């Protein structure tokens, strides 16, 4: 019944608090000692003092214990004893700030102002870098209305050159007292101790509030002179003071003063983007649009020149500088390029990014000379100067040699172009130059020169498979099959040293060449080499088999030759040659497939054997009949499960079961195998 009443009762915060309070553990109250007379009081005080002294004997460095001891004596109104304890504690560690603060607060609490003043004087003398003690001293004196003493304390404190907070506090005090001349004197010392931009700007704000235009301008001038005289002043501080100075002058309508200030500043610090941006914004707001762009561009040009004088290897700046000169100072562009070539020569003896960027700008200069100046002797001289700078024994730039040769070709000076390319190959052969020279001679149909160049190219880099293939293709296009065949043979010899992968590429092209030349027997021989070189790759077996169905038989060749003799051409004047797959082609293809199947069967490579059978099946689907297709389909392997015992553990595995292998077994073995499988099935 009681439970139901509780469930129906509303739960309130009051009920929750009462329940929590009732479950709260009761803490046993400490024994209270009632002191009835003076005798008992003195006895209790003696015992407490003994306890404190005993604890301090064990650990006299526990300053918090000293403070509790002294506070106890103050609570007992025994000021003499409390002072004695504080003094003893200060002898232990006079640098403990909370001890000084409690000592001073205790004296102030008992209105012992002179004693508190003496303590503050002692504390600030002993610890002049502790701002808290100074502020407490100042608070005490200012609350008593002793402005003269406060000013003296501030003066003494600032003689120690404290942080900005002390100076700001002194300035606020004098401002409250309306002693503005004293504030100016303080600022004059403040900026010497803390010559940062923030200090100067505080002084400026003060003069803007309590001074006149002349005083503000004087402070700005002093600030700018002082900050620029220090070599370690950050540029951002100088930018701030100049920006503030110029903005203030503009606000007073002194636009020429502001403009002159920006101009001198940009000339003095040309690398300052902030000053340039401020100057641009000023001109947009107060200047004329006619001269603003020219002023900005001139300043930017001077900035680039100053920067490149200090760092001539900054090629990105050179590029931008040349862009600017080309756009606005066209008459100075040639001298700018010449300065670049002379001043920005890379020092590195390796072909790094600095050389590439240097040559890129040189190429730009050469293009400019040819398209604009068109002074041929000057262009040749510049080409020669640039080529003389490059250490060709270490590296070279094929693009530059090719440009020089193309320039001479455009001047119809083919002999000079060949000489340039020859010098390039003699000093530092480059594949790019070889290819360009070869293509040039091919276009000129100077094939004897092309052959010599290919021989030099292969001699320079015999491991380049592409050079061998291009050389062979050249001879093939020229109709010299023997030369082409010889190049293929030499490239595959051991003396050349091509890698296996490159030899596979060569022999593949070699087969295509012999096929195009109708040398099918040679192509078959190459396929045999191809198989050996590829370690009897299954795909090459398949390709060889299919190859037999893509070439004509002897009968077809004879028919083609007779047709050729009879002059049987189509409408376009080309020879007709109709090719059909004959039973002979199919026979050769199937024979190679069977050879591949036997090879992989002999070497127990079931996966590859299956792949060959699958390819044979696809072939029969296209070129076979129903009978051959069914035979090949019947030879396809199936996946069977078998049990294998490994380390006395019977495991299941899967293998490919080829019908050809079953057919090859004798009848008795087949019967036994069938009976064993039937018994295994019945047992399971």
Swiss-Prot record:
The keyword Repeat applies. InterPro entries: HAT (IPR003107), HAT_Syf1-like_N (IPR055433), Syf1-like (IPR045075), TPR-like_helical_dom_sf (IPR011990). GO terms for biological process: spliceosomal complex assembly. GO terms for cellular component: post-mRNA release spliceosomal complex; precatalytic spliceosome; Prp19 complex; U2-type catalytic step 2 spliceosome. It comes from the Eukaryota. It holds the Pfam family HAT_Syf1_CNRKL1_N. HAT repeats lie at residues 43-75, 77-109, 111-143, 145-176, 178-209, 211-251, 253-285, 295-327, 332-364, 374-410, 412-443, 445-477, 518-550, 584-622. It is found in: Nucleus. Its main location: nucleus. Keywords: mRNA processing, mRNA splicing, Nucleus, Repeat, Spliceosome. Associated with the spliceosome. Involved in pre-mRNA splicing and cell cycle progression. Required for the spliceosome assembly and initiation of the DNA replication. Belongs to the crooked-neck family. This is Pre-mRNA-splicing factor CLF1. It comes from Kluyveromyces lactis (strain ATCC 8585 / CBS 2359 / DSM 70799 / NBRC 1267 / NRRL Y-1140 / WM37).
């Amino acid at each position: 019944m009681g439970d139901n009443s509780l469930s129906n009762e509303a739960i309130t915060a009051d009920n929750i608090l009462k329940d929590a309070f009732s479950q709260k553990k009761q803490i046993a109250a400490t024994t209270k000692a009632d002191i009835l007379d003076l005798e008992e009081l003195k006895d209790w005080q003696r015992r407490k003092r003994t306890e404190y002294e005993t604890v301090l004997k064990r650990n006299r460095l526990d300053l918090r214990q000293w403070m509790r001891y002294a506070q106890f004596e103050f609570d007992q109104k025994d000021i003499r004893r409390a002072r004695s304890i504080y003094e003893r504690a200060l002898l232990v560690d006079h640098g403990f700030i909370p001890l000084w603060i409690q000592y001073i607060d205790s004296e102030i609490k008992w209105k012992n102002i002179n004693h508190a003043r003496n303590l503050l004087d002692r504390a600030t003398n002993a610890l002049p870098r502790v701002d808290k003690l100074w502020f407490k001293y100042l608070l005490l004196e200012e609350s008593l209305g002793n402005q003269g003493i406060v000013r003296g304390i501030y003066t003494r404190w600032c003689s120690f050159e404290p942080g900005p907070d002390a100076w700001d506090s002194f300035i606020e005090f004098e401002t409250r007292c309306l002693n503005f001349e004293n504030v100016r004197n303080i600022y004059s010392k403040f900026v010497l101790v803390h010559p940062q931009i923030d200090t100067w700007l505080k002084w400026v704000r003060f003069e803007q509030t309590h001074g006149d235009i002349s005083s503000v301008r004087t402070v700005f001038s002093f600030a700018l002179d002082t900050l620029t005289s220090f070599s370690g002043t950050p540029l951002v501080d100088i930018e701030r003071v100049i920006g503030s100075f110029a903005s203030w002058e503009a606000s007073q309508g002194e636009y020429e003063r502001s403009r002159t200030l920006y101009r001198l500043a940009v000339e003095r610090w040309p690398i300052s983007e902030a000053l340039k941006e401020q100057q641009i914004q000023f001109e947009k707001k107060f200047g004329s649009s006619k001269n603003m762009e020219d002023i900005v561009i001139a300043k930017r040009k001077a900035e680039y020149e100053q920067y490149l004088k200090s760092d001539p290897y900054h090629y990105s700046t050179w590029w931008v500088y040349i862009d600017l000169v080309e756009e606005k100072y066209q008459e100075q562009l040639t001298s700018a390029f010449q300065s670049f070539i002379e001043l920005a020569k890379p020092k590195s003896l390796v072909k790094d990014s600095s050389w590439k960027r240097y040559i890129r700008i040189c190429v730009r200069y050469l293009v400019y000379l040819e398209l604009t100046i068109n002074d041929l002797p000057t262009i040749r001289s510049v080409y020669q100067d640039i080529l003389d700078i490059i250490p060709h024994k270490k590296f070279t730039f094929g693009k530059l040699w090719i440009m020089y040769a193309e320039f001479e070709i455009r001047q119809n000076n083919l002999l000079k172009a060949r000489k340039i390319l020859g010098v390039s190959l003699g000093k530092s052969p480059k594949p790019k130059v070889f290819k360009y020279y070869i293509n040039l001679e091919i276009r000129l149909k100077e094939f004897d020169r092309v052959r010599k160049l290919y021989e030099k190219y292969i001699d320079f880099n015999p491991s380049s498979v592409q050079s061998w293939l291009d050389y062979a293709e050249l001879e093939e296009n020229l109709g010299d099959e023997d030369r082409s065949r010889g190049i293929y043979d030499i490239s595959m010899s051991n003396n050349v040293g091509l890698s296996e992968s490159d030899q596979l590429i060569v022999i593949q092209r070699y087969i295509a060449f012999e096929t195009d030349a109708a040398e099918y027997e040679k192509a078959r021989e190459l396929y045999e080499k191809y198989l050996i070189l590829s370690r009897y790759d299954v795909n090459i077996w398949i390709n060889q088999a299919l190859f037999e169905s893509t070439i004509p038989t002897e009968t077809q060749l004879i028919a083609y030759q007779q047709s050729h003799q009879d002059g049987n051409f189509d409408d376009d004047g080309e020879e007709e040659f109709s090719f059909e797959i004959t039973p002979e082609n199919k026979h050769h293809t199937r024979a190679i497939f069977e050879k591949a199947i036997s090879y992989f069967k002999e070497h127990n490579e079931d996966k590859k054997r299956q792949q060959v059978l699958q390819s044979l099946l696809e072939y029969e689907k296209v070129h076979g009949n129903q009978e051959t297709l069914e035979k090949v389909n019947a030879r396809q392997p199936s996946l069977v499960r078998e049990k294998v015992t490994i380390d006395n553990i019977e495991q299941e595995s899967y293998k490919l079961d080829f019908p050809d292998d079953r057919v090859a077994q004798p009848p008795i073995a087949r019967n036994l195998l069938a009976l064993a499988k039937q018994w295994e099935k019945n047992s399971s």
